[in-house]
Amino acid sequence: MSAIDDLPPLREVIREHQLSARKALGQNFLLDLNLTARIARAAGPLEDATVVEIGPGPGGLTRALLALGARHVIAVEHDERAIPALQAIAERYPGRLEIVCTDARTFDVRPYLGSTKAKIVANLPYNIATHLLIGWLSAEPWPPWYDMMVLMFQREVAERIVARENEEAYGRLGVLANWRCETKILFDISPSAFVPPPKVTSSVVRLVPRTAPEPCDRRALEQVAAAAFGQRRKMLRQSLKSLPTDPARLAAAAGVDPTRRAETIPVSGFVAMARELTNSRDDNKT
């Protein structure tokens, strides 16, 4: 990481560019370059890789990604104040850092990639992290334009992402995430590592897209999961009443006991119910 050593410390960068964290942008800057390097290494070998980073801020993780060999980093930053700091990094790594100043929620990175698969590696702004993740998990067609995500979330959100049936954090997000990806919490980061320190512990999560998830319509899966977890303490025969079909019949046809509750149903059970929901709609059309 010799090239990084030539760049100013991140605290100096923040001071020089007056990058006080803005709560409205969900900013908490990670200044420890050992931790940013650990996050970057969690994405596996970076040599010749294309990496999409959301919310680079002063560029700590950006520097680690480039120093570890990423061929092309696309840094998407909404805060115009951070652009000069990122441009200084780009000068150290000519032709390897592409800076896009825009809102990640409306940004389509695919035209920047062509046929290249990317990795998404980011300390996500907390206020839009779940929104972004759901968008990436909803990508069509599948497999998606990325082959791995290494992302930082609040610990509570990370637990929801990796949760399985019969775990307290299990819900709609866990169903979608684990249907389409293999998920794992890699490590935690203390609030004291950030400026300003958040009130909660953060966790780094790795999501690897499944090549062939169990087949079902994504929208039907989301609809079934939303209904079931909307009244998670009730039996499926009650909680699924908002669906346009008989809930007990739907569950039974999917091989799921309609007296069970959402929190006890594995992802495969939700997939089976989503398929039955799609089938019932098709039957009604004929």
Curated annotation (Swiss-Prot):
Binding site for S-adenosyl-L-methionine: 28, 30, 55, 77, 103, 123
MF terms (GO), sorted A to Z: 16S rRNA (adenine(1518)-N(6)/adenine(1519)-N(6))-dimethyltransferase activity; RNA binding
Cysteine pairings via disulfide bonds: none
InterPro entries assigned: KsgA/Erm, rRNA_Ade_diMease-like_C, rRNA_Ade_Mease_Trfase_CS, rRNA_Ade_methylase_Trfase_N, rRNA_adenine_dimethylase, SAM-dependent_MTases_sf
Family: Belongs to the class I-like SAM-binding methyltransferase superfamily. rRNA adenine N(6)-methyltransferase family. RsmA subfamily.
Function: Specifically dimethylates two adjacent adenosines (A1518 and A1519) in the loop of a conserved hairpin near the 3'-end of 16S rRNA in the 30S particle. May play a critical role in biogenesis of 30S subunits.
UniProt protein name: Ribosomal RNA small subunit methyltransferase A
Organism: Bradyrhizobium sp. (strain BTAi1 / ATCC BAA-1182)
Encoding gene per record: rsmA
